[in-house]
A protein has these predicted regions:
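Secondary-structure transition/hinge residues
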Residues: 1, 131-138, 250, 313
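Bacterial N-terminal signal peptides that target proteins for export
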Residues: 1-8
Length: 392
């Protein structure tokens, strides 16, 4: 079902409704939202709690601007003196401008007046929900990031650096909402799983990278080739955590299907995912020779976390994952700025409470065995619960 078709049922209400002045939260609006019980996207009434201005889309979860263009070179992000502030100052060729959301009210509800308004209000609702869930899971101090809608973002090859449907771009510490694609069933910015994944990536940057625009290990690669493995490990781990949180918030192991059909089957978490020697061998291959694909290894982590949640205590697993972020940062700092796969996995287990630890140990040791993860120190002190399906 396309976005325009989802919007049709309420058009009649707009004819009789009058245009209103600007309003601020709290208020309820009709948006495109995910229904986990029926596993569909539909128009639904949702409460928005953090908008200071609906008309301007300004709020404590992030401020929206639209249009403009930006180009950022990888070499610029790797300068030792680069900061998010300096990169933002130099990246924009034409500045995005303010938005003016058109809406009407009827029967105490806000109705976005057109597709553009529906897109922005629906995204903001998904962003609020993702941030609220992250707070429940133990991360309540996520900084609000700018939101750029339909901004033309390019790299040195004049390609989008967010080619896989991602919404969050770390070097600029900002959300970028792509132009709507009529071929997509649900645009990524309206897909709750995609938004939750983006929020997880932001949380990783804020904690593990201490707010740096890139992985600190990336600055070591020129003089320490071993740092390349760390960079690739981190790319996969943060994607795996993002995919897990996207699955947990939607209760849908195939949330990719609605927006990312080209990668959906490869990232779906409804089937066993196992590490391989090929994944291990890819970790130290320079990107100039073969660009690293972080998704296969990331999917192994996401599956291990999701299956642990299904078979034990999902709250314990997800709060453990969120609580592990400082431990992952510490493991990287204690290893000369380089992150080892086993150390990161052990940090997740160590931060997990109760019987879920044993299930998590079983899943991680099973899924990552082919990547030479045969022992996790924390697992030596807890009972390892064998997973339902084996990779060995």
């Amino acid at each position: 079902m396309r976005l325009a078709r989802i919007a049709l049922p309420w058009l009649a209400a707009l004819v009789a409704a009058g245009c209103t002045q600007d309003i601020s939260s709290p208020f309820s609006a009709v948006v495109v939202a995910w229904d986990p019980a029926n596993q569909i996207y539909e128009l639904a009434q949702v409460k928005l709690s953090t908008l200071v201005s609906l008309r301007d889309m300004q709020g404590t979860s992030g401020n929206v601007t639209a249009g403009g263009s930006a180009r950022l070179l990888t070499s610029d992000t790797l300068r030792p003196t680069a900061s998010i502030s300096s990169l933002r100052q130099g990246a924009f060729l034409t500045a995005p401008g303010p938005v003016a959301v058109e809406f009407n009210t009827a029967n105490g509800l806000v109705y976005p007046e057109d597709e553009a308004a529906l897109e922005l209000v629906s995204f903001y609702a998904a962003l609020e929900k993702s941030r609220a869930e992250l707070s429940i899971w133990g991360f309540s101090n996520l900084v609000a990031a700018p939101i750029f809608s339909h901004t033309d973002l390019r790299n040195e090859d004049f390609l989008s650096p967010l080619a896989e449907g991602e919404l969050f771009y770390e070097p600029l510490n900002a959300f970028f909402l792509p132009v709507l694609n009529p071929k997509q069933q649900i645009p990524p910015q309206l897909n709750l799983g995609v938004v939750a994944h983006a929020v997880a990536i932001q949380a990783w940057q804020q904690v593990v990278w201490a707010g740096a625009p890139v992985d600190p290990a990336a600055l070591l690669v020129a003089t320490d080739p071993a740092a390349l493995t760390s960079v690739h490990v981190a790319q996969s781990l943060r994607i795996g955590i993002g995919d897990f949180l996207g699955t947990l918030i939607t209760v849908d192991p195939r949330w990719f299907d609605h927006s990312l059909p080209q990668t959906a089957s490869a990232r779906a978490l409804d089937q066993l995912r196992c590490g391989s020697a090929a994944m291990l061998n890819a970790l130290d291959v320079p990107d100039k020779d073969v660009p690293y694909d972080p998704y296969p290894l990331g999917t192994v982590l996401a599956y291990s976390l999701w299956d642990s949640a299904l078979n034990s205590d999902p709250t314990a697993v997800v709060t453990g994952v969120v609580a592990a972020l400082p431990g992952i940062a510490a493991a990287q700092n204690q290893n000369g700025g380089k992150l080892a796969l086993a150390a990161a996995l052990d940090a997740i287990v160590a931060a997990t409470q109760g019987s879920a630890q044993g299930y998590l140990c079983g899943e991680l040791l099973n899924g990552f065995h082919a990547l030479s993860v045969t022992d996790l120190p924390t697992c030596d002190t807890v009972g390892v619960h064998a997973p339902p399906a084996s990779c060995q």
